[in-house]
């Protein structure tokens, strides 16, 4: 999807709001809202294929999920899996996705030679209530310069190099 998943465009065929799912520079499929339920899985499987195809050479995989951005459309396999409603269900699905990518790296014996960074770009969308996420004890949200709007996690995974359980208080940008 070339834009945020809340920015669908009307089609010429009836004015429905759709989201173009791209493969390289071509539209592979036009997704209506409910079609977004398949997108995390589609991105994940494409990432696994990419890793497998490129396992014998250096690669950079950039996997920017549209998940956890309103409107919320977790796959039906994850419906009701969390105690935090639809937003939490989509968090569960992204957790599955990251696990699938990490497992692929392990199976191909690439895990000790691959740095994986997991991060976010902003805090929750306060105007959407719980459906937009929560910043916990931090004040502020998306579009705000308070900590709740700009402080996001960054997790580094690199077995044998990045020591588990360590943390750093340095500043980074996404």
Where do the model's predicted regions map?
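Loop/turn elements at helix/coil->beta-strand transitions in domains of secreted/extracellular proteins
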Residues: 55-61, 110-116, 150-152
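Active-site-proximal beta-strand/loop segments in catalytic clefts of secreted hydrolases
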Residues: 64-68, 73-76, 119-122, 150, ...
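Metal-dependent active-site segment of extracytoplasmic phospho-/sulfohydrolases and closely related
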Residues: 93-130
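Solvent-exposed loop/turn segments at secondary-structure junctions
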Residues: 3-5, 66-70, 96, 122-125, ...
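Substrate-binding rim/cap in mid-to-C-terminal beta-strand-loop elements of soluble/periplasmic
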Residues: 14-15, 19-29, 99-108, 127, ...
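Acidic, His- and aromatic-enriched active-site or binding-groove loops in soluble protein domains
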Residues: 1-7, 91, 136-142
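Active-site-proximal segments of metal-dependent phosphoesterases and phosphodiesterases across multiple
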Residues: 81-95
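Formylglycine-dependent
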Residues: 1-59, 65-74, 156, 164
């Amino acid at each position: 999807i070339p834009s945020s998943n809340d920015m669908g465009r009307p089609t010429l065929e009836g004015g429905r709001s759709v989201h173009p799912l791209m493969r390289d520079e071509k539209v592979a499929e036009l997704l209506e809202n409910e079609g977004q339920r398949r997108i995390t899985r589609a991105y994940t499987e494409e990432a696994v294929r990419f890793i497998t195809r490129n396992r014998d050479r250096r690669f950079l995989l950039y996997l920017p999920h549209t998940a956890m951005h309103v409107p919320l459309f977790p796959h039906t396999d994850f419906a009701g899996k969390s105690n935090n409603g639809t937003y939490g269900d989509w968090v569960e699905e992204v957790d599955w996705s990251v696990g699938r990518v990490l497992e692929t790296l392990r199976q191909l014996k690439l895990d000790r030679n691959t740095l994986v960074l997991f991060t976010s770009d902003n805090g929750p969308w306060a105007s959407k209530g719980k459906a937009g996420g929560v910043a916990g004890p931090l004040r502020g949200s998306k579009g705000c310069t308070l900590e709740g709007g700009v402080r996001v996690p960054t997790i580094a995974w690199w077995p044998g190099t990045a020591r588990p359980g360590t943390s750093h208080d340095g500043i980074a940008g996404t």
